[in-house]
Every structure is written in structure tokens, then in C-alpha cells.
Curated annotation (Swiss-Prot):
Pfam families: zf-C2H2_11, zf-C2H2_ZNF592
The protein, known as: Zinc finger protein 592
Organ and tissue specificity: Expressed in the brain.
Gene name of the record: Znf592
Gene source species: Mus musculus
Glycyl lysine isopeptide (Lys-Gly) (interchain with G-Cter in SUMO2) cross-link, renumbered residues: 200, 204, 546
Function: May be involved in transcriptional regulation.
Family: Belongs to the krueppel C2H2-type zinc-finger protein family.
Cited Gene3D superfamilies: Classic Zinc Finger (3.30.160.60)
InterPro entries: Zn532-like, Znf-C2H2_11, Znf_C2H2_sf, Znf_C2H2_type
Alphabetical UniProt keywords: DNA-binding, Isopeptide bond, Metal-binding, Nucleus, Phosphoprotein, Repeat, Transcription, Transcription regulation, Ubl conjugation, Zinc, Zinc-finger
Biased composition (Polar residues): 454-463, 1241-1262
A single cellular component GO annotation: nucleus
Length: 1262
């Protein structure tokens, strides 16, 4: 006891002070934490004592902030490094023990470990004598505790070493209580800055005088005293504990200092701040206020340490004469000390009063009053220190804080034995930090605080702070924020370092670190009713800083990356004749700044495809797919307009292939491709809409009095300006497509009016309103107008791929497309999650990685382009059909060709330009007459003829051209369609527009299951289109071109292609490169071809009938052909003698067998006989010779029989020729054969001669 040095009162209370802002330069950097001296305002030095816990009172809900004593400059890293190098004789609070020599430079300074309550840490070996560290206290939860990182230490006025070393108390071994009293009496007592923070309406502070700088230096001095019996830091630690928790009355004198040291630590986020932060404006404001109060005190406190305790108290009260004593301004601890301190009976008894201002509680709306607390420290003879903190009732002149408004607090004892407590009620703790901790006004900090508080267990955390407790409208907050914006530059550090420098209570997380935390929760009613004595342990205060996840970095990079492409500026001066109305600034993209002259261009800009961005929006609770950055930003802007901030939990960014970049953008409207059409789904009957929206009108004008143009919609009874606006009304596309699909024909209609008009088509009910243009038609002409003029049934339901936007006509095609283009099949290993493209790779993997496992086949898994994986194929198919209704899109198919269009006007323009339409009634009549004979198909049904229009009464007023219009109309009605479209049910005679609907109709209505491709002309159906085409070609094709062999005498085969015929002639007849010009015939299913009969009947008689010109033409052509042709060369002649004299030159020798009919040579007679039998249909050479003689008789016999009808029936591929059909032969040609009288006298040989002539004489023709 005797050799224990007691700290001076001035030095003790100087720890509550803050530096002089007049000597601070906000632009200079504070020395880094690695330097020996540390700035008291440096936020990066705040640390946590992980090994000490605090004693704390109050229940968790009522204590929004723990009692945290924060020193802004302490080095957590250095502390941990020095943890094992502490002198054994140092006291717990940093005071030197009696076994250490006094140090004039350090005995009066409070070490950072002492200030922060670090009981086992010291940095005296690293502190230079000329550098001292000022000690700001109670700054953890106020803006003054968060200086900007660039405030230097040397410019704060703390580097000036003054006469404070003289006032450092010496270490007399026997007198401890006296020096402590003297130190307390001489210590300058500034305002408690924790409560200065809550002075919202203080007058503007004035600059500090020079004396305040010295006083601040004194507050920055740190003391390292030996540790033997006296633990003097507990006194100061208790005062800090009180300020942190004003509701706690100290009655136990032992356990507070160890926990208090931990409470003064700082979140890791503050420790990690760089050394270039700047002084907050709140620091300057509050320091200036403090300097006025202690200006006169410092002058008298500096000379020595032997002054009376009453002196500083009185002078301190005089040092701040201008400070207001309003309920909203904090009261100085000097006043409390002057009013409440009384000399103790024991020299080791120290009493001091302190007052502070607490922030309003959550429910309190009135400004809080300043509580008064008495701190009593008693040093017993056994070396123990007892401290008691009790609340003093407010003064009568302080009406802002009544006892009813201040719920009773609790008393904390710090000694093993109970200490006598002072009378009075204790002040609650929760009001003091709820506002101070969140005063920075950072919503990000508030959110982090909420998250941290949620992580804290209820039993270990008495602190519950939410962002809703942030006071708004605070003058001090606004002043601090303005000055911070003007002085502190924005840093380029991550978001955590961009937070305000004030220590946010919302950023503190309370978790027990090294000492078990025990919290005694008390209800608010008990706290407000009576003072209570409670012992508790406050957990460490720190913040668990989590690095931003990668998804956030990627998302921020996508959102905030600069646009490398320069802004696009359009030409906003279109030609005058274009009739395009362009805004003055064009249509501007709010995301990237590009401008466009047309609104459609802007929509295409938003729908461009440049990157694949898949985001799971937490606000929408669904996964969204974007193909460019602008569409993503527009979605985020939509949330921002509602006051929300877009957040994502999943993000997938990947490039897209070049073939998917330029696919057609999905079009949701069937209206013309104009900006006004897409922007105004419901055109109003105004001149602007009528001129800007051009609907798809009928292909050609209808005949007179068959349709009636109206201006009123028969469905919604809305009046329109003209028929064009009415057509636009029926063709507009609504966003809601639910209930617009016809259940009969599965057609997707654009809107409700068009849907109702379409339903009446199936019901055959009037009024007969066209669903496309809205005109009213007569029932007889209605189907023709709808099918052919307005092309209503060209509407098809398409299915758009959600991955690439390609539209398919059927779901089966869409499924095949997704499986081929957007799905991948992998072979998964049976023992691990690895999957490979091929089964062999999986096998190799199993062999190398799982050699001990039994062999198992790989499992097929299916991966969709949306990154979902399925282990069964049916699951991925179900995945495809989940949102089928959302993928439907209206398309238009040309009835003449397989082209598809996304907009109706494009289809109409294509039909006009490519296929042609009549422009008037006369042209319509000519078109009908030209298509009457060629378009008559079995499945086509001509509409009924409408009743004739009575125009005779108006004959005088009609022109000559108008008289024929009813007849032209009848012809137009009677003419069949240019192309047979759709299917007609043979049972109910219902016409169905598309194939899928026909198959569905047959199954639902008649119970017949058809295959996928039914035939229009019969009831057969097929699985694939090639089988259907073959069926139509063989059974229903009206014009079929066949190739028949002319060398075959009987049952000549026909071939569909000339190549097959050429092969046949080469193989069967031995003729290479035959002339096929006369072998193609046109065969009609209903009757035989005249040319086929001509081949079978080369000789025909002559007839004078004019209707048989075809037979005469064929006969004339035949007469010019030679009868004998050499098969070895190109020689041909009509003379048999000349032919017989020609062929011997091709005979190699006399022993070679040669055919006398074609000149071919064979090695043996058997081969020749086989040739004669197969080719010439003769048994042997002699029979062939007889055939030649019989050929010579044919011509005169046919001439003799001229003028008579020959009745013959010949079958050609199953086709019969009428027996009475006359065959005409032109005898005007030259006769190639001489008349033989003998053969003419034998008419019985005529049939045989005719047959022989067909087999032999026709050979040269082919």
C-alpha cells in the first residue's frame, strides 16, 4: 500500500476528454497502427479483448447497447503480439506496481490497455516518451468516436509534451487514499462524451482555446502502474461502466474491471480501417463544447497534484459558464461532483458524481433527461476496492426527466463482499446507446446491425437494436453528415469501408468469446418500479465481418460496369413524306443512354440478345432470364420505383452463341409493326390512332351488298370512327391470353371481341361478324370472306422456346428442339457425382478412380439449358410442358406455301406480292374461270351460292359493267379454293383448319384414333409425311407421268423415273443410251392414255371425226420413224433388205449367231434363242424370219381396212380402253412398205400381222 502510486484526479478524469479540434488538420493522415504513437481518434485501432467479459445489468430487450467503452486508437494486432510479453508486476488496469521504478513520462498516462480495459496488455515499451496518446472516452457509440482516418496524431496537439509530467503522482508506498483523493480533486472533469452525443440542439460550438489543447493532452496521458495490492483501474473502469450503462448502480467491488476491459473493445471493422480517415464534424462540434467547459480548469490543474478536490470542481463549473442547462444539454460531471461528493470518513473512500444524457427509448417520444449518478470507491485495508454507482434523483429544475419517465435501473457490485450502496434509484441503460449507436444514419449499418443482433443469443446479449430506432431529423446528425460530405473524399474501398466512421451500435454483435455470459433478464415493470441489484456478465462486443460473397461482386459488376460502346444518337429529322412523328429527344433508353427515333427500335434495343443473365430475384421470388444488361437494369428500376432494392440470391452469367444472337425477337402483337400499334393495345377512335395504326385489311374488295362496313363493334358495342379503326380493334393483342384459345379448333385469338366473333362461326349464329376486320357478311358469303379474303384460318398457335425464342407450330417440335439444342445427356458415375459425355469416359473414370468397387453401368442424366438436371427422361419432358400456356404465341401461316409470319400484315403483303389476288370483280371472274378446271379436287367444297341480287330495277342507273356483277359474284362463289386447306370430316362434314385439330376432333367426336398424318382425300393415316406423300402420289395424284418401255411387246412395264426405264432397256434389251423422248406418257386414273394404246396398236385406221386429232397426231409422228434399227450402231432404215445387208458387218465370223431383228451377235445359239424369246418374243430364228415376212403384209392390210371401226380391248397397267373408240391414222404420209397382193388377198392374217408389227416394227422408233 505504501509504495503504491495513486493516479492524480486530473489525470483520471482527463481520460474522459477528447482532443482539441482547433489543432487538428482533417487532411493530414493519422499515423498507421504500426507506428508507436496512436491517435485517440483512429477507428482502425479499436479492438476487442477476447479474453475478458463484462458485468452488465438489465434485461436483453431493455438494453439496446451494452456498456462498451471505446478507445478509438488501439492496435489489436499489436495487442495480440504483446500478449505474452507483459511485465508480471503490472496491475490489471495498467498501473505500475511497487516493485517497478517510477517513470516520469508514463506514470501519469493511461495506457490504451487501461482505457480499453485490457487487463493483460501493455505497450510502454513501444511508446516514446515524447509521444502521448489522448484518451477519448465514451466514443464507441457517438459520432465523435469515429474520426475520419486521415486526422494526424501530431497535429492534434497531443504531441506537445507539456508540464503534465510534473503533475504525475509519485509512488509513495504508504499513502494511497490521500493521493487518490487529491488526484480526483485535481482531475479536470469534462463532459461525458457519450451523453454529449445526444445534445441535439446545442448552439454552434466555438473553437477551443489553447488551454483546452493542453488539457486534452492531459486526457491523453496514460499511466502504467505496478500491480501488487491496489487495482486502481477498477475505479476508472467503474466510471466507464457507469457511462456505458447508466442504469447500473455499482455495489459489488470486484468483478467489473475485467469485464469492463472487454466492453471497451471495438468491432473488427473499426480495427481494419485504414489510417487515412478524417475527423468527423461531430468531433469538432462536441470537442468545442467541451473545451469551453474546461478552459479555466486546465490552467489551475497543470502545476501539481496536491490541489484540493474542491478546487477543480469549482473551477470546472466556472470553466463552462456558457453551457446551457437545458434538459436537452448534458450536464457536466463537475456539477454532479460538486453537489454530491462529500469527504469520506476513510481516506480510501472516494465519491464522485457524474451525469449524462440518455437517448430516448424506443417508446419514448419526449427528450430524455440527464441522469445523475454517484460513483463511490472504497479502498479497504485488505487491498480490495469497492465501488458503488447509484442514481441521484434529478434536480427540481430538470423537468424533462421525471422519476416516472426514468425506469429504475439496477445495481452492480464488483467485490466479493456487498458494499453499502447510496440512496436513490438507478437509471436504465437502454436509452443511452440506442440512439448513439445508430446515429450515423447508415441504412446499411442498420441492416448489418440487425443481422448481427439476430445472431446473438437471447441469454448472452442484452442488446437489441433495430434500424427503426434511428432518430430522424437530428440536427447534430445532419450537421455531421454535411461536414463529412465536404471534408471526407469517397474511398474506393469495399462497401464495408464506405460506411460512416461513427461506431454504429447496429454494427456491433454481442457473442460470448472467452468468458461464459450470464444474463439476468428483468421485466421492464420491475426495472421501473424499484432499484435492483443484479450481477451479470456482458459478452464481448465485436462484429463478425463477413466478406461479400462472389455472387454479390458479380452482380455489382454486371450492374455497375461501364458501357464500352459510345452512346447512339439517331437522326431525329425524318423525311417529310414519311409521316413519322419523332419526339424532340427521341426514345431514350434510361439504362444506357442510347436514343432511338422509333419506339419499336427502343423495344428491339431492350430485346436484343448479347449475354445470358439468369437471376433469382428475391423480391419477385422467381428466376428471371435477361439477354442484355438494359433489360436487367430496367427490372431493377421497376423495383426501385416501388421503394425497394433489387436483391438476388442466384446469378448465372454466360455468353450466348452467335447463332442465338440474331434469332427473331418474340412478337406479342399481331398489329402492324409500328410504334403506336405496340404501345396502344386499345386504339381509340381518334385521328392520331387511325392514322398511325394500319390494320390488316381484306385482300380484295368484296362484291356489292355482300358485306356491310360498320363503325360499331358488335361485341363490346364500342363506337369507332371508321372501318379501319374497327379492324384495328379486332386485331389488337391483349397481354392476358387466358381464355382466348378456341376449344374446337385450338386457335389463339388476339382479344375477347375477336374470340366471341370466332365462336359464332362454329355455332353458325348471327350476326356473322368477321373476327379479323369486323365487317358483317351474309351467311352465304361469310365462309368465303373469312377463309379466302381475310385469311382468318391462317392464324396458328405457335410455341416459343423460352431459351432462344424460336417459335414452333407444335409442342412435339418444340420438345424435339429443346432436346436437340438445349439439353445435354451425361453418363453419371454410379459411385460419385462425376458425369461424362460418353459412356466410355465414365467407364475409364470408374476403372481409375473406383477400382475396388464392383462394376455398375453408368446412369443417364439429362441437363436442361436452365441448369436443372433430371435422372429420368420423363421428368425432363414434364419439365418442358410445365409452362406451355406461357409459351404460346400467335403466328400466321400462308395458305399457299409453308411460310410463317409473326404479324398479319406481313402475311397479307406476302400473299399479294407472291400469289396474287384479284383487284376487281372482272379480274375475280377471270381468275375463277382459269382455276375452274385445274383446282377441282375431291376434298374441296364450294360454298353455297348466295341469292342473286335484284338489280333490274336499278338498270337505268347502272353502267354496263355493273350489270354483270351478280353473275361474276356467283362465279366467284362457285369457284373452288386455290389450294385445298384443312380437313373435312367425312362423318359430320365439319371442316377443321389444321391437322392436329382434325386428329383431335376424330378422337373426341367419333372415337377414332388416327395416326399423325391423315390423308385429306381418304380415311387413311400414316406415321410419317413420306408415307403420306407416297400414298397421295400412287392413289390420288391426278396427273402422273410414267415411262413405258417400247421394246416390250406385251404388258409393257411403266417406270416413274426415266433412269429406271433406261436401266430396264439396257439390261433387258441390250440397248445402251436409248432415246427416251417418246417414252413419257401422261396417265389418268379414270381412263387409258391414247399414247399407250398407240404403242400397242401401231396401225390405226383413218377417221374424219374432228374430235380425234390426238390420234392423228400420234399416227403422223409414228409414220416418220424407221421400222428397222441396228442395235450395234445408229443405222436405221425402212427397208428390210437394206437392214439385212447392213447387220452382217457387225458379225465377227460366220459361226457367230446373229439376231436378224436387231443385229446383236451371240456366241451360242442358245443365247440367241434366249434373246429372241425375251426381247423379240419369238421362239427361234426361223420364227423371227417369218415375223419379218408378216410385217411386210401389215401396211396394205391396214390400208384396205381403212374407214372401218376396229373393236379391240387392250389392257395397259390395269386400264381398259373403250372398244368402240375410233382410231384415226393419217394415210397422207409416205408408205414405207410395198403392197403385196398375196397378203392383201388373205385378210385372215391381219390380226397376227398387227401383233408382229407391234413387236418388230416399233423397235426402231424407241
Amino acid at each position: 500500500m505504501g509504495d503504491m502510486k495513486t493516479p492524480d484526479f486530473d489525470d483520471l478524469l482527463a481520460a474522459f476528454d477528447i482532443p482539441d479540434p482547433t489543432s487538428l488538420d482533417a487532411k493530414e493522415a493519422i499515423q498507421a497502427p504500426s507506428e508507436e504513437n496512436e491517435s485517440p481518434l483512429k477507428s482502425s485501432g479499436m479492438c476487442i479483448d477476447e479474453n475478458v467479459s463484462l458485468s452488465h445489468s438489465g434485461s436483453a430487450p431493455d438494453v439496446p447497447a451494452v456498456s462498451v467503452i471505446v478507445k478509438n486508437t488501439s492496435r489489436q494486432e499489436s495487442f495480440e503480439a504483446e500478449k505474452d510479453h507483459i511485465a508480471p508486476s503490472l496491475l490489471h488496469n495498467g498501473f505500475r506496481g511497487s516493485d517497478l521504478p517510477p517513470d516520469s513520462h508514463h506514470c501519469g498516462k493511461f495506457d490504451s490497455t487501461f482505457i480499453n480495459g485490457d487487463s493483460a496488455r501493455s505497450f510502454t515499451s513501444k511508446l516514446e516518451p515524447s509521444k502521448s496518446e489522448p484518451l477519448p472516452t465514451f466514443n464507441q457509440f457517438s459520432p465523435i468516436s469515429s474520426p475520419e482516418p486521415e486526422d494526424p496524431v501530431k497535429d492534434n496537439g497531443f504531441g506537445i509534451k507539456s508540464k503534465h509530467s510534473d503533475s504525475y503522482f509519485p509512488p509513495p508506498p504508504g499513502t494511497v487514499g490521500g493521493p487518490v483523493l487529491e488526484a480526483l480533486s485535481k482531475f479536470p472533469v469534462p463532459e461525458l462524451h457519450m451523453f454529449d452525443h445526444f445534445c441535439k440542439k446545442e448552439p454552434k460550438p466555438e473553437p477551443l482555446p489553447l488551454e483546452s489543447q493542453q488539457e486534452h493532452e492531459q486526457g491523453g496521458q496514460k499511466v502504467v502502474e505496478p500491480h501488487k495490492d491496489l487495482d486502481s483501474s477498477r475505479f476508472f473502469g467503474e466510471a466507464l461502466e457507469f457511462n456505458s450503462h447508466p442504469s447500473n448502480s455499482i455495489g459489488e467491488p470486484k468483478k467489473l474491471a475485467p469485464e469492463l476491459s472487454a466492453c471497451s473493445s471495438v468491432p473488427p471493422r473499426q480495427r481494419l480501417k485504414p489510417a487515412h480517415s478524417k475527423l468527423s464534424s461531430c468531433v469538432a462540434a462536441l470537442v468545442a463544447l467541451q473545451a469551453k467547459r474546461v478552459a479555466n480548469v486546465t490552467k489551475e490543474d497543470q502545476p501539481g497534484h496536491t490541489k484540493d478536490s474542491s478546487g477543480p470542481t469549482k473551477e470546472g463549473s466556472k470553466g463552462s459558464p456558457k453551457m446551457p442547462k437545458s434538459p436537452k444539454s448534458p450536464r457536466s460531471p463537475l456539477e454532479a461532483t460538486r453537489k454530491s461528493i462529500k469527504p469520506s470518513d476513510s481516506p480510501r473512500s472516494i465519491c464522485s458524481d457524474s451525469s449524462s444524457k440518455g437517448s430516448p427509448s424506443v417508446a419514448a417520444s419526449s427528450p430524455p433527461a440527464i441522469p445523475k449518478v454517484r460513483i463511490k470507491t472504497i479502498k479497504t485495508s485488505s487491498g480490495e476496492i469497492k465501488r458503488t454507482v447509484t442514481r441521484i434523483l434529478p434536480d427540481p429544475d430538470d423537468p424533462s426527466k421525471s422519476p416516472a419517465e426514468s425506469p429504475a435501473g439496477s445495481t452492480i457490485t464488483e467485490a466479493p463482499s456487498e458494499a453499502p450502496g447510496d440512496e436513490g434509484t438507478a437509471m436504465p441503460v437502454e436509452e443511452h446507446f440506442s440512439e448513439a449507436g445508430i446515429h450515423s444514419g447508415s441504412p446499411q449499418g442498420d441492416r448489418k446491425g440487425d443481422e448481427n443482433m439476430i445472431k446473438t443469443s437471447d441469454s448472452s446479449s442484452p442488446c437489441r437494436i433495430s434500424g427503426s430506432r434511428v432518430p430522424k431529423g437530428s440536427a447534430l446528425n445532419s450537421q455531421a453528415s454535411k461536414k463529412q460530405q465536404s471534408t471526407a473524399p469517397q474511398a474506393s474501398t469495399p462497401a464495408a469501408s464506405l460506411l460512416p466512421k461513427a461506431v454504429h451500435l447496429a454494427n456491433l454483435n454481442l457473442v460470448p468469446h472467452s468468458v461464459a455470459a450470464s444474463v439476468t433478464a428483468k421485466s421492464s415493470a420491475q426495472r421501473r418500479s424499484q432499484p435492483q441489484v443484479t450481477q451479470m456478465t456482458v459478452p464481448l462486443v465485436h462484429q463478425v465481418k463477413k466478406a461479400a460473397p462472389l455472387i454479390v461482386e458479380v452482380f455489382n459488376k454486371v450492374l455497375h460496369s461501364s458501357n464500352p460502346v459510345p452512346l447512339y444518337a439517331p437522326n431525329l429529322s425524318p423525311p417529310a413524306d414519311s409521316r413519322i412523328h419523332v419526339p424532340a429527344s427521341g426514345y431514350c433508353c434510361l439504362e444506357c443512354g442510347d436514343a432511338f427515333a422509333l419506339e419499336k427500335s427502343l423495344s428491339q434495343h431492350y430485346s436484343r440478345r448479347s449475354v445470358h443473365i439468369e437471376v433469382l430475384c428475391t423480391l419477385c421470388s422467381k428466376t428471371l432470364l435477361f439477354f442484355n444488361k438494359c433489360s436487367l437494369l430496367r427490372h431493377a428500376r421497376d423495383h426501385k420505383s416501388k421503394g425497394l432494392v433489387m436483391q438476388c440470391s442466384q446469378l448465372l452469367v454466360k455468353p450466348i452463341s452467335a447463332d442465338q444472337m440474331f434469332v427473331a425477337a418474340p412478337v406479342n402483337s399481331t398489329a402492324p409493326a409500328t410504334p403506336a400499334a405496340s404501345s396502344s393495345p386499345k386504339p381509340s377512335p381518334t385521328l392520331d390512332n387511325a392514322s398511325s395504326v394500319i390494320p390488316a385489311l381484306p385482300l380484295y374488295p368484296d362484291p356489292v351488298r355482300l358485306i356491310r362496313y360498320g363503325t360499331k363493334c358488335p361485341e363490346c358495342h364500342k363506337q369507332m370512327r371508321d372501318y379501319m379503326v374497327l379492324a384495328t380493334h379486332f386485331q389488337r393483342t391483349t397481354e392476358e391470353t387466358e381464355g382466348l384459345t378456341c376449344q374446337v379448333c385450338q386457335m389463339l385469338l388476339p382479344n375477347q371481341c375477336s374470340f366471341c366473333a370466332h365462336q359464332r362461326i362454329h355455332a353458325h349464329k348471327s350476326p356473322y361478324c368477321c373476327p379479323e376486320c369486323g365487317v358483317l357478311c351474309r351467311s352465304a358469303y361469310f365462309q368465303t370472306h373469312v377463309k379466302e379474303n381475310c385469311l382468318h384460318y391462317a392464324r396458328k398457335v405457335g410455341y416459343r422456346c423460352i431459351h432462344c425464342g424460336v417459335i414452333h407450330l407444335t409442342l412435339a417440335l418444340l420438345k424435339s428442339h429443346i432436346q436437340e439444342r438445349h439439353c445435354q445427356v451425361f453418363h453419371k458415375c454410379a459411385f460419385c457425382p462425376m458425369a461424362f459425355k460418353t459412356a466410355s469416359s465414365t467407364m475409364d473414370h470408374s476403372t481409375t478412380q473406383h477400382p475396388t468397387q464392383p462394376h455398375k453401368p453408368s446412369q443417364l442424366i439429362y441437363k436442361c439449358s436452365c441448369e436443372m438436371v433430371f435422372n429420368k427422361k420423363r421428368h425432363i419432358q414434364q419439365h418442358f410442358y410445365q409452362n406451355v400456356s406461357k409459351t404460346q404465341a400467335g403466328v400466321f401461316k400462308c395458305p399457299e406455301c409453308p411460310l410463317l409470319f409473326l404479324q398479319k400484315p406481313e402475311l397479307m403483303q406476302h400473299v399479294k406480292n407472291t400469289h396474287g389476288v384479284p383487284r376487281n370483280v372482272e379480274e375475280l371472274s377471270s381468275l375463277q374461270s382459269s382455276t375452274d378446271t385445274s383446282s377441282n379436287r375431291p376434298g374441296s367444297r364450294a360454298p353455297a351460292e348466295p341469292p342473286a341480287t335484284n338489280v333490274a330495277a336499278r338498270g337505268s342507273s347502272l353502267t354496263a359493267g355493273r350489270w354483270g356483277r351478280p353473275e361474276a359474284h356467283r362465279r366467284a362463289e362457285a369457284r373452288p379454293r386455290m389450294r385445298s386447306t384443312g380437313w373435312t370430316c367425312q362423318e359430320c362434314q365439319e371442316w377443321v383448319p389444321d391437322r392436329e385439330s382434325y386428329v383431335s376432333h376424330m378422337k373426341k367426336s367419333h372415337g377414332r384414333t388416327l395416326k399423325r398424318y391423315p390423308c385429306r382425300q381418304c380415311e387413311q393415316s400414316f406415321h410419317n409425311p413420306s408415307s403420306l406423300r407416297k400414298h397421295i402420289r400412287n392413289n390420288h395424284d391426278t396427273v402422273k407421268k410414267v415411262y413405258t418401255c417400247g421394246y416390250c411387246t406385251e404388258d409393257s412395264p411403266s417406270f416413274p423415273r426415266p433412269s429406271l426405264l433406261e436401266s430396264h432397256i439396257s439390261l433387258m434389251h441390250g440397248i445402251r443410251n436409248p432415246d427416251l423422248s417418246q417414252t413419257s406418257k401422261v396417265r389418268h386414273p379414270g381412263g387409258p392414255s391414247p399414247q399407250v394404246n398407240h404403242l400397242k396398236r401401231p396401225v390405226s385406221r383413218m377417221a374424219d371425226a374432228p374430235g380425234t386429232s390426238n390420234g392423228a397426231t400420234v399416227s403422223s409422228t409414228k409414220r416418220h420413224k424407221s421400222l428397222f434399227q441396228c442395235a450395234k450402231c445408229t443405222f436405221a432404215t425402212d427397208s428390210e433388205l437394206e437392214f439385212q445387208s447392213h447387220i452382217p458387218q457387225h458379225q465377227v465370223d460366220s459361226s457367230t449367231a446373229q439376231c436378224l431383228l436387231c443385229g446383236l451377235c451371240y456366241t451360242s445359239t442358245s443365247s440367241l434363242n434366249r434373246h429372241l424369246f425375251i426381247v423379240h418374243k419369238v421362239r427361234d430364228q426361223e420364227e423371227g424370219g417369218e415375223d419379218i415376212v408378216e410385217v411386210k403384209v401389215e401396211a396394205p392390210d391396214s390400208e384396205a381396212c381403212s374407214g372401218e371401226e376396229v373393236a379391240m380391248e387392250t389392257k395397259e397397267n390395269g386400264l381398259e380402253e373403250c372398244a368402240s373408240e375410233p382410231l384415226v391414222t393419217d394415210l397422207g404420209g409416205q408408205q414405207g412398205l410395198a403392197l403385196d397382193e398375196d397378203s392383201a388377198q388373205d385378210p385372215q392374217n391381219q390380226p397376227q400381222a398387227s401383233q408382229d408389227q407391234n413387236s418388230h416394227a416399233l423397235s426402231p422408233q424407241v
